[in-house]
A protein has these predicted regions:
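C-terminal nucleotide
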Residues: 1-6, 11-23, 29-148, 159-194
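Conserved glycine-rich beta-strand-loop-beta hairpin in the small C-terminal domain of fold type I
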Residues: 156
């Protein structure tokens, strides 16, 4: 094998992802390759956000499959039919992003969690959530600072910022409810061997 740079790996990973979803942003490939927390823009690239990464996440799987292109189309339709509301949500999201970047730097779990829940409310307004997602978010509320859809929406998983003081109880109770779930930490290294 020849040694590949991280940028080469990202290019190859994006090409592979495009076989499934032609308009992939490349964000997932980039964060997996570089690790940590990043700010990502499809045209502008990425910038690492320095954070102590001192938190635990819970991933819950709804078991519902979805098609990213269908969900993206729903967002596009919402935007075209609700231009003012969509613009307002984008402006709110810009403020939210600024606040959460600072919260990541400070490792402020309460602000990060509140921001995740706020973002979920915006996704609800756009229409890419569903009853199963809402049920999971309500269920994890007692164990997390906040939670939201991860990925395209319309199914798939949610991600919750865990309160580690009751993580064991959270995992037991979520599994009793027959949810596939697991806890994770953020890997700050990313890809280190290929």
């Amino acid at each position: 094998f020849t040694e590949l740079s991280k940028e080469n790996v990202i290019d190859l990973a994006i090409k592979a992802e495009q076989t499934i979803f032609k308009d992939t942003s490349g964000a997932d490939c980039t964060v997996c390759t570089h690790g940590g927390i990043i700010e990502y823009d499809k045209q502008g690239g990425f910038k690492k956000i320095n954070s102590p990464n001192d938190f635990t996440l819970i991933i819950l799987n709804s078991g519902q499959t979805h098609t990213t292109s269908v969900t993206v189309s729903k967002v596009k339709d919402f935007k075209e039919n609700n231009e003012e509301k969509f613009l307002s949500l984008c402006e709110k999201e810009d403020v939210l992003i600024t606040n959460i970047k600072e919260a990541f730097r400070k490792n402020d779990l309460k602000v990060i969690g509140k921001s995740m829940s706020e973002n979920q409310n915006y996704l609800e307004e756009i229409g890419i959530s569903n009853d199963k997602i809402r049920e999971m978010i309500m269920l994890v509320k007692n164990y997390a600072y906040g939670s939201k859809i991860t990925g395209a929406g319309d199914g798939g998983c949610i991600i919750a910022l865990a309160d580690v003081t009751n993580l064991d109880d959270a995992m037991k109770n979520l599994q009793v409810k027959n949810y596939e779930c697991f806890s994770v930490k953020i890997d700050s290294r990313g890809l280190d061997t290929f």
